Amino acid sequence: MAIKQFNLAEGQRAERKLLITVAEWKETQTTTPQGGGDPVTEEVTVREILGTRTEDSSIEYNPDIETTTDIRGFNYTDLNKTQPQQGFDPYLILGGSKLGAFLNDIRKRNAVSELNQFTMYIITAYIGTEGAYEAEKHVQCTITYDSLGGDTRVNFPITVYFSNNVTTGTVDKLSDDFVFTADVNVQP
């Protein structure tokens, strides 16, 4: 895959809103057909763009580094892996937040095994063009809720743990109803 250039003018700084994190998960929904009949249960994909009301959030890569010094006094550094994560604090309880309601349901049931079922997208809208923004798709990620409370508003801070099981590609738009297209001929 060729290195893509930033779609910014010379010296222009990328705005933070151009780095977008999206959570995706499956939910079971039951609906009753119009006009009656038996209820229909189906699994649907749900997405939410993270960061509403969060003032600062960064992906931290947490490198696992091993440094050794040989008998000649030279230092060698080995990077074993990265363990990327991203915190969202505050992550306020907001009306209409699909992820907040989903996580709160998991919290109430103490169903912690359900916290590792997320697909996460990192969209870098400062790379690519309209209709083909660069993106990474991470499968089997974990989202944890860190606390519940606050002073004047109910805060429910969360942390996203990316799996490093990544597929690169593009998304066609910067909303939660995007279509992800995987890159072809990319070796993992």
Locate the predicted segments by residue:
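Extracellular/virion structural assembly segments
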Residues: 5-9, 71-137, 171-173
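Ser/Thr- (and often Asn-) enriched beta-sheet segments in non-cytosolic proteins
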Residues: 26-30, 41-45, 60, 87, ...
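Surface-exposed ligand/attachment interfaces on beta-rich extracellular proteins
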Residues: 34-35, 69-73, 175, 188
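Mature, Sec-exported extracytoplasmic domains of Gram-positive
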Residues: 45, 51, 67, 82-84, ...
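Mixed-charge, glycine-accented linear interaction segment located at domain edges/termini
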Residues: 138-188
